[in-house]
């Protein structure tokens, strides 16, 4: 009997250990990787780059980066003032999202002081490229460069280059050149399509005029 009991105990112990390990793996929360974000104070006079994997970590690093002593703050989206107060909503936001930290008594205000009109925006050109250089760590070699290209004010692409070291700089440069080649290819396709439309319109107008003159002569 004792031998059978020892044998049963020897079988149960590994199963119990496996069950505890499986439970630990299943119920341990998933750790999200750290992502780059931009944060600013209420009047946009100070901006910083922050790497964070969770909402709480972002708020904590933002308070340190902007040297804010109070703990009663509200995190909102800089573009429209939407409050970010849940982890689920925070994880749905993309990299390089711009946030604004509001202390007690402060309110979100739009970036421009003029009142927007309902008239459609005027196209100032075919493409616009903006560069945003910032540092996530004071010890970084150069910092991080965010390149954003907007074509026809409809299509927008962005790329984030992290230049924290010499090797990282070369690696990021090669990636940027490859990405630039892809963007240039897309831009040439859009430009070619636009030029074909312009040429087709110019060819159709003379043909319509000649048809109208022919009808007038026959009459």
Swiss-Prot record:
UniProt GO molecular function: lipid transfer activity; phosphatidic acid binding; protein homodimerization activity
UniProt cross-references to SUPFAM superfamilies, sorted A to Z: CAD & PB1 domains
InterPro entries, A to Z: CIDE-N_dom, CIDEA_N
GO terms for cellular component: cytoplasm; cytosol; lipid droplet; mitochondrial envelope; mitochondrion; nucleus
Keyword set, alphabetical order: Activator, Apoptosis, Lipid droplet, Nucleus, Transcription, Transcription regulation
Known tissue expression: Expressed in omental and subcutaneous adipose tissue (at protein level).
Keyword Kinase (UniProt): no
Subcellular location, principal: other
SMART domains hit by this protein: CAD
Region (Amphipathic helix): 163-180
GO biological process, one term: negative regulation of transforming growth factor beta receptor signaling pathway
Subcellular localization(s) per the UniProt record: Lipid droplet; Nucleus
Substrates-to-products reaction catalysed: a triacyl-sn-glycerol(in) = a triacyl-sn-glycerol(out)
Domains (record comment): The amphipathic helix mediates embedding into the lipid droplet phospholipid monolayer, promoting phosphatidic acid-binding, thereby facilitating triacylglycerol transfer.
PANTHER family, per the entry: CELL DEATH ACTIVATOR CIDE, LIPID TRANSFERASE CIDEA
Family under the similarity heading: Belongs to the CIDE family.
Role played: Lipid transferase that promotes unilocular lipid droplet formation by mediating lipid droplet fusion. Lipid droplet fusion promotes their enlargement, restricting lipolysis and favoring lipid storage. Localizes on the lipid droplet surface, at focal contact sites between lipid droplets, and mediates atypical lipid droplet fusion by promoting directional net neutral lipid transfer from the smaller to larger lipid droplets. The transfer direction may be driven by the internal pressure difference between the contacting lipid droplet pair and occurs at a lower rate than that promoted by CIDEC.
UniProt disease link: In omental and subcutaneous adipose tissue of obese patients matched for BMI, expression levels correlate with insulin sensitivity. Expression is increased 5-6 fold in the group of patients with high insulin sensitivity, compared to the insulin-resistant group. This observation is consistent with the idea that triglyceride storage in adipocytes plays an important role in sequestering triglycerides and fatty acids away from the circulation and peripheral tissues, thus enhancing insulin sensitivity in liver and muscle.
Assembly: Homodimer. Interacts with CIDEC. Directly interacts with CEBPB. Interacts with isoform CLSTN3beta of CLSTN3; inhibiting the lipid transferase activity of CIDEA.
Protein name: Lipid transferase CIDEA
Native source organism of the sequence: Homo sapiens (Human)
């Amino acid at each position: 009997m004792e031998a059978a009991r020892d044998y049963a105990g020897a079988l149960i112990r590994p199963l119990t250990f496996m069950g505890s390990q499986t439970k630990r793996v299943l119920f341990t929360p998933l750790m999200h990787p750290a992502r780059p974000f931009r944060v600013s104070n209420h009047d946009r006079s100070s901006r910083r780059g922050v790497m964070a994997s969770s909402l709480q970590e972002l708020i904590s690093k933002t308070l340190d980066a902007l040297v804010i002593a109070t703990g009663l703050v509200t995190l909102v989206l800089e573009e429209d003032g939407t409050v970010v107060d849940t982890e689920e909503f925070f994880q749905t936001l993309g990299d390089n999202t711009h946030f604004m930290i509001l202390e007690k008594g402060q309110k979100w205000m739009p970036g421009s002081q003029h009142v927007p009109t309902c008239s459609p925006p005027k196209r100032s050109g075919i493409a616009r490229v903006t560069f945003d250089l910032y540092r996530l760590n004071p010890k970084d070699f150069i910092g991080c460069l965010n390149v954003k290209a907007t074509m026809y004010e409809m299509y927008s692409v962005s790329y984030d280059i992290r230049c924290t070291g010499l090797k990282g700089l070369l690696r990021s440069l090669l990636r940027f050149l490859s990405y630039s080649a892809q963007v240039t290819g897309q831009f040439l396709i859009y430009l070619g399509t636009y030029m074909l439309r312009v040429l087709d319109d110019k060819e159709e107008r003379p043909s319509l005029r000649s048809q109208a003159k022919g009808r007038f002569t026959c009459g």
